[in-house]
């Protein structure tokens, strides 16, 4: 149904009958922002689109934004497909595919452990320039030759900017193809998705550059508490040491990041495309069978490690290559999985409830407030499903 009504004047797009609570939650989020916000939210239920909304002075249905670390989720959906087809094995050593990796005590690290941020290779002491960070081959070469910061497989620490450069090197060694090429050929291309690891030049005019956070004392305190020293693991993981680095929120603004599409952080797309991709991974979409079998979904959605994250400095549960989404959003069913992105981006699937969800915002936001926003939208989405009598 087309949106009308004074309460939702800022919201454009459509929701299916019964999913009006999501529209209302999105309108409330916009009203609470305190300034005009460019944002998109999309969802699918049982494979069909039920939410496709956008707002903001510059945003349309096809506007493109940086998805930051939600790119990892896209990359790891590719890894899941390759595991399903027997090209990769979660219980094989990384060094089996990448022999040069077997140095500095890393020789026994398993692929599933690499995917769950257990490698101890969160960055380099000297850091990376933006140009270097956008080059997955260079990042993988440096980290593959490096001694880890902890004994691999014994702890976890968020490999914020480099995780999928490492898994991408495994993919490249096993397939002789680049991650971006395989994502396009196996995932986004067949589905016709406006989601890119390597933005085509002709799509540049639709890209919206990111905007900095609206600073408040509370938000600044949260950022400072999570930053730590540049010399500590958080500083290394978030690349705070290199003189030619940049703030995380600025990364998609760099043309080299957009054009190369590094597999950890360089994805550009729409909320509609992300929601469709996660739907297609778990359910039939547009006449196509689900990309992943139930046993593959279960293997990747299971919790691989849970405990104190050495980078995030808080308790964190990691599935295999994904966030264990129900640990963050308890309203979701067990087995939900996805990946957030810096500043408030989110994409996930709840297979038991047959839902997929994606949200993109242009202006950076601290994690606690982003999580609260997603919780409200997801609660509204599940309320809509329960209205149909179908929620798990």
Predicted regions and their residues:
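Active-site helix/loop module of the DD-peptidase/beta-lactamase fold
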Residues: 61, 69-70, 82-126, 144-145, ...
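Active-site-proximal alpha-helical segments within enzyme catalytic domains
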Residues: 117, 163-170, 261, 265-285, ...
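Short, gly/Ser/Thr-rich active-site loops of penicillin-recognizing serine hydrolases
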Residues: 262, 283-286, 296, 301-308, ...
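Catalytic-site signature segments of enzymes, centered on catalytic residues
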Residues: 64, 123-206, 256, 260-269
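Short glycine/proline-rich turn/loop motifs
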Residues: 4-7, 57-59, 145-150, 250-261
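Active-site SXXK
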Residues: 26-27, 47, 66-92, 167-172, ...
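Short, conserved catalytic-motif segment at the N-terminal edge
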Residues: 12-68
């Amino acid at each position: 149904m087309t949106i009308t009504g004074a309460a939702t004047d800022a919201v454009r797009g459509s929701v299916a009958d019964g999913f009006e609570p999501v529209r209302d939650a999105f309108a409330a989020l916009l009203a609470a922002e305190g300034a005009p916000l460019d944002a998109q939210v999309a969802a699918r239920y049982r494979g069909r689109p039920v939410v496709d909304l956008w707002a903001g002075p510059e945003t349309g249905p096809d506007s493109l934004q940086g998805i930051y670390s939600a790119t990892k989720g896209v990359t790891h959906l590719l890894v899941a497909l390759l595991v399903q087809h027997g090209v990769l094995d979660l219980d094989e050593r990384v060094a089996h595919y990448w022999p040069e990796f077997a140095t500095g005590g890393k020789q026994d690290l398993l692929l599933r452990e690499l995917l769950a941020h257990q490698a101890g290779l969160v960055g380099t002491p000297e850091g990376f320039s933006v140009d270097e960070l956008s080059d997955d081959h260079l990042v993988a070469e440096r980290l593959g030759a490096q001694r880890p910061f902890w004994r691999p497989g014994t702890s976890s620490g968020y490999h914020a900017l480099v995780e999928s450069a490492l898994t991408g090197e495994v993919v490249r060694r096993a397939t002789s193809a680049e991650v971006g090429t395989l994502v396009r050929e196996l995932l986004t291309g067949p589905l016709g998705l406006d989601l890119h690891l390597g933005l085509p030049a002709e799509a540049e005019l639709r890209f919206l550059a990111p905007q900095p956070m609206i600073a408040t004392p509370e938000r600044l305190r949260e950022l400072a508490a999570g930053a730590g020293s540049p010399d500590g693991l958080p500083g290394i993981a978030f690349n705070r040491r290199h003189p030619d680095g940049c703030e995380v929120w600025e990364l998609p603004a760099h043309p080299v990041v957009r054009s190369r599409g590094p597999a950890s952080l360089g994805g550009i797309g729409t909320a509609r495309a992300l929601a469709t991709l996660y739907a297609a991974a778990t359910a039939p979409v547009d006449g196509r069978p689900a990309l992943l079998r139930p046993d593959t979904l279960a293997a990747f959605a299971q919790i691989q490690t849970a405990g104190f994250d050495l980078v995030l400095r808080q308790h964190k549960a990691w599935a295999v290559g994904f966030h264990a989404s129900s640990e963050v959003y308890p309203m979701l069913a067990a087995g939900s999985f996805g990946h957030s992105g810096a500043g408030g981006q989110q994409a996930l699937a709840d297979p038991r409830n047959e839902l997929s969800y994606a949200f993109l915002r242009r202006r950076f936001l601290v994690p606690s407030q982003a999580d609260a926003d997603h919780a409200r939208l997801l609660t509204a989405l599940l309320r809509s499903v329960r209205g149909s009598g179908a929620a798990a």
